[in-house]
Swiss-Prot record:
Similarity comment: Belongs to the TatA/E family.
Stored Gene3D superfamilies: 1.20.5.3310
Subunit structure: Forms a complex with TatC.
Listed name of the protein: Sec-independent protein translocase protein TatA 1
Subcellular locations according to the entry: Cell inner membrane
Keyword Nucleus included in the entry's annotation: no
Assigned keywords, A-Z: Cell inner membrane, Cell membrane, Membrane, Protein transport, Translocation, Transmembrane, Transmembrane helix, Transport
Functional summary from the UniProt entry: Part of the twin-arginine translocation (Tat) system that transports large folded proteins containing a characteristic twin-arginine motif in their signal peptide across membranes. TatA could form the protein-conducting channel of the Tat system.
UniProt superkingdom: Bacteria
GO cellular component, one term: TAT protein transport complex
Coiled coil location: none
Membrane disposition: Single-pass membrane protein
UniProt source species: Aquifex aeolicus (strain VF5)
Length: 59
């Protein structure tokens, strides 16, 4: 698999800008970042560990 060329990245960013608009772009980026963060947490099992700690403290 090869990396996209710089002009391809610019084209993709322009298409995203046209679709979402400049005002919505920060919200889209924030949502994407949160989604990736939650996905990584789910893969590492961090949520399960937090739940176990809360149960232990509540007992």
């Amino acid at each position: 698999m090869h990396f996209p060329l710089p002009w391809q990245l610019i084209l993709i960013l322009l298409v995203i800008l046209v679709i979402f608009g400049a005002s919505k772009l920060p919200e889209v980026g924030k949502g994407l970042g949160e989604g990736i963060r939650n996905f990584k947490k789910a893969l590492s099992g961090e949520e399960e560990e937090k739940g176990k700690e809360v149960k232990k403290e509540g007992e």
